[in-house]
């Protein structure tokens, strides 16, 4: 099944902030971060069910290869809804706070 992938508006801001951070370290690192995040999002179009369910059994996560971030999303019918780009180093309690707010 091919899914439509939609993102909350804040996800674009989070992606841009991560790219800017890595570009401040190295332009090539910023480009690589952007490519890996886009690759993760594109992978959801065909493989959304392949990733780990979180403990609420509603949301899933897909890691961003080579970077300490993950996208958190849910699946509704044929739509993947990306809700956040979450730093894996952050306290998981923050993830749940953001999901319920």
Task: Give each language-model segment a name.
Residues 1-34:
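Arg/Lys-rich, positively charged N-terminal/basic patches that mediate binding to nucleic acids
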Residues 11, 37, 73:
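GIY-YIG nuclease signature motif recognition
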Residues 13, 25, 29-32, 50, ...:
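Solvent-exposed interaction patches of small proteins and small membrane subunits
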Residues 39-64:
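A short, surface-exposed loop/turn module that caps and links secondary-structure elements
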Residues 63, 72-74:
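Well-ordered beta-strand positions
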Residues 74-101:
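Enriched for short, Lys/Arg-rich terminal
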């Amino acid at each position: 099944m091919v899914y439509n992938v939609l993102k909350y508006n804040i996800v674009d801001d989070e992606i841009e902030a991560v790219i800017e951070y890595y570009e401040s370290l190295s332009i090539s690192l910023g480009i690589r971060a952007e490519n890996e995040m886009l690759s993760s999002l594109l992978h959801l179009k065909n493989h959304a069910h392949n990733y780990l369910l979180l403990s609420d059994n509603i949301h899933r996560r897909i890691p961003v290869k080579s970077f300490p971030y993950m996208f958190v999303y849910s699946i509704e019918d044929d739509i993947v809804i990306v809700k956040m780009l979450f730093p894996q180093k952050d306290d998981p309690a923050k993830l749940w706070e953001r999901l319920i707010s």
